[in-house]
């Protein structure tokens, strides 16, 4: 078990990175994205708090410090941006999120609305339909011979077949949803090629999303219409409602797509674990959780200090960016036994793949439901999952995911 790091206010601000190890690692470089694990180990072993000279930010890569930062939103705020850009110094590229880029108490009010829309009762109501759609998708893929691209044909196709309907979106234009989510997560990074090219290509995706978030374009009974209904009760304003719909459009899809992709990739690489899942399909939920821990589709997020603070013995001044390495925390041997092993019976509670604290991923219940029913369908209907060709990574400043993963599904 890890012990909580000390977190105390200090009266004298520090110079940038004074008293902590300075590292030349660039966590936004393509070679880092290709294989982040060696450098994540370097980050963890260097100390509980480090300074990354490339981008002039502090970094925390061990579980204890990542957890501490996530769970102290008053000291480590989100309203100045959860990417490298500091909204106090730079204009945001879009109107800030009322969920992701907000702090309590404002965040508490808007988050409460989404929590009501995406309640456990709502997930229970959706479960049978989502499970039937997962069964139908696996049947369809097996009927095609089982030689598929796990990303386009399953990890993307399944969520796109159920989530937009649950949101109440029109059929036309749904192809904009994934590029928009990719744009949002690239924009959290530095002004590199990934960020710049995503923003340059973003006009049609942004226009589509802005239009879909308006009340007249959302079908009655869907998540979007339910969000707008809260503006009638005064819990949110009519101006806030479209921004909350926008938050759900990205949070409810990208986490699911990358989580399912991670899980299928893990089960293909570790056939013994897939055999355990086939023997006990009730492990589907935990197999999905373990894949989110193991692969950590959301790798990083930033916070900004609201005051001078001491974290694990390191003094950090007010207004400093702190980069949290979620993926590294999820493989920290100080917290996890044998962290580099995918184990579908592991006690995964506490992983930070969906964040932690008040800003825990708003789409997590949707992602978990979809992930569980897809893996349960695979467990019942498929005897083997084998990698059938070279994979291709999809590079993103925040997300770790795959562009393509050829696999062969053998029917049970």
From Swiss-Prot:
Its EC number is 1.14.99.15. The keyword Electron transport does not apply. It is found in: Cytoplasm. GO terms for biological process: xenobiotic metabolic process. Keywords: Cytoplasm, Heme, Iron, Metal-binding, Monooxygenase, Oxidoreductase. It comes from the Bacteria. One of its GO terms (molecular function) is heme binding. Pfam families: p450. InterPro entries: Cyt_P450, Cyt_P450_CS, Cyt_P450_sf. Its cofactor is heme. GO terms for cellular component: cytoplasm. PROSITE patterns: CYTOCHROME_P450 (PS00086). Heme binds at residue 361. Its main location: cytoplasm. Substrate binds at residues 94-97, 247. It catalyses: 4-methoxybenzoate + AH2 + O2 = 4-hydroxybenzoate + formaldehyde + A + H2O. Belongs to the cytochrome P450 family. The oxidative demethylation of 4-methoxybenzoate requires the participation of the monooxygenase CYP199A2, the ferredoxin-like protein ThcC/RPA1872 and a ferredoxin reductase to mediate the transfer of electrons from NADH to CYP199A2. It is also active with 4-ethylbenzoate. Interacts with the ferredoxin-like iron-sulfur protein ThcC. This is Cytochrome p450 CYP199A2. It comes from Rhodopseudomonas palustris (strain ATCC BAA-98 / CGA009).
